[in-house]
Curated annotation (Swiss-Prot):
Annotated organism of origin: Escherichia coli (strain K12)
Name assigned to this protein: Uncharacterized protein YhhL
PANTHER family attached to this UniProt entry: INNER MEMBRANE PROTEIN, INNER MEMBRANE PROTEIN-RELATED
Pfam families in the cross-refs: DUF1145
Superkingdom: Bacteria
Length: 89
C-alpha cells in the first residue's frame, strides 16, 4: 500500500520536473528544477545499473518493462523487488 503511494508521488515528481521542460517556470525556480531533474535521472540510472550488475548472469534477465519501472520509480520499485524475492525464498 505505502509502496503504491510512493510510486504515485514519484510519478507526480516526474510530471513536475518534465513540465518545467515543456513550460519553463520563472527564472530562479527553473534552474533548481532542472538541477533536480538531472539529479533524479542520474540517481535512478545508477540504481538501475547497480541492480543489473547484482543479478546473476545465468539467471533470468530483467525485461524492458521492469527496467523502465525501476528507472521511473527508483527506490519504491526496489522495495517492491525486495518484497517479491523475500516471498520466493
Amino acid at each position: 500500500m505505502l509502496i503504491n503511494i510512493g510510486r504515485l508521488l514519484m510519478l507526480c515528481v516526474w510530471g513536475f520536473l518534465i513540465l518545467n521542460l515543456v513550460h519553463p517556470f520563472p527564472r530562479p525556480l527553473n534552474i533548481f528544477v532542472n538541477v533536480a531533474l538531472i539529479f533524479t535521472v542520474l540517481m535512478h540510472g545508477m540504481q538501475l545499473a547497480l541492480l543489473k550488475s547484482t543479478l546473476p548472469k545465468d539467471g533470468p534477465q530483467m525485461t524492458t518493462a521492469e527496467k523502465v519501472r525501476i528507472f521511473l520509480f527508483g527506490v519504491f520499485e526496489l522495495l517492491a523487488w525486495q518484497k517479491k524475492f523475500k516471498v520466493k525464498k
